[in-house]
Amino acid sequence: SKIKFQMFIRLRANQIDMLNKRSEFLRAKFESKRILLTNEIGAQISMANNLFPYRISFSNYINTTDLRFFARYNFLGGLYIGDEEEGMIISYTVPGGIPIFHDISKPLLGKTKTSAPAIVFVGETGAGKTQLADLEAFQNMIFKGMKVLTVDPKGDREKKIKLLGDNAAHLKIGSKDCSSGMFDPYLMNQNDDREALGQAMRDIDSMLNVLGLSIDTNFRAIEKAHYDMLKDYENRIIHQKTLTYLISEKLVKYDKTTAEQVMTLANDSTMRLFFATQESRYDSAFNLTKPYNLITFEKMPSTAGEKMENDPNRLDNAIFAMLFSRVQGIIDGFMKRFSKQETIVVFDEYKVYQKTPGGEEVVDNVVRQARTLQTHPFLITQELSSISDAILNNVGEIFVGSLKSSKEIEFILEEMKLSNHPAVRGALIDHTQDEGVTEEKKYNFLMQDYNNRKC
């Protein structure tokens, strides 16, 4: 059988004569391999329709044009092979239309003033910050082979999962597809009883906090229950160690009140993930080894107030704090597993992490390990001012889209030392909801790169 494929080649030259020479040389090379350059016909037309949505057909074999002609159809159109410039084109300056070449690998290679690889994308809803972050992630995934892990509390990337098919993995925490007990400390640490015990102690302590009970955690009782369970496992009374068995069958003998109270959580739609049965199996979803990996949540947490005990959503927030502790373990495993190659970890809706107890620590942990584990953290938020100083001090690059808050605009201009530039201030004012606004005004971004340059 024959394999059919189509290549679309763009040649670059500063002069028409040189362009013609290169095209003739290329044509000769193709013909020597029995490959003829032809007009688009038949199957090629459908290919062109997919590549160029507006159906631009070419009447000549060679078209003389500029870079922007190609990039306006598809972000891949702005790419080319060669080392004349470094990086990939992500956008164009306004005004001027000068292509912006971007290489997120440079900080890790010591080729920039800052060695911090983290990037922050800021802007209002609809300003394009998520699209820009995903553009960066997908470009580097496709052309550099970087694996991507995205943690998205709002869960609006499912179309991308369907598009990528077998090249993507999706862990939707709390969904019906998640088996009960997938976060059970004994299932997650099957070969390390000591680590499993330590995690079980922390989990039970956190569960008492979830319930809001004024009960001191009896760690000694948990330890006794643990060793009793190990004996049952060695004697083959049970074939699997679980937190459920530890609490319901063993801890109840030493601390009945704690055991009975904690077991009431086993029926909660989310907390069931911490309670395995003898039939539960370690969830394969933790093997996030695809080019693109996504973690979402079936249920979004409410924003926690400063006084969590007075919050009517205290239970949900406390549960979500426990989930974040498990998410941190998943992210750490992903980063360490691929530490010999560059990876990207995307945190969308940063404010959710900030407002959920333990959430910001997850982000901070990734940012601090980024250089050591060759990771590029992407943080997406509506407010740069919401990011803690500890994290912001480890950010190397910032993209700022349109903003509604004048206070936030002033904070960013002060952070970037651009307070005396009224034109920049005007460009950041939100136009996403303006009637008849042009694309150029709607999706403008202020960029500060790894070398502290602004555009």
Where are these regions (language model features)?
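Glycine-rich phosphate-binding loop of nucleotide-binding enzymes
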Residues: E86-I173
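Extended, folded cores of ATP/NTP-driven motor/assembly subunits in large transport
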Residues: S1-F69
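Conserved H-loop
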Residues: D152-P153, D348, T375, I380-S386, ...
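A short helix-turn-beta junction within AAA+ P-loop NTPase domains corresponding to the substrate/partner-engaging
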Residues: A168-L171, A390-S402
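Hydrophobic "anchor" residues on beta-strands that sit immediately upstream
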Residues: V148, I344, F378
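Phosphate/diphosphate-binding loops
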Residues: M416-D434
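P-loop NTPase motor domains
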Residues: I35, S46-I100, G155, K159-N167, ...
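Short regulatory helix/loop adjacent to the ATP-binding pocket of P-loop NTPases
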Residues: K159-G165, S386-N394
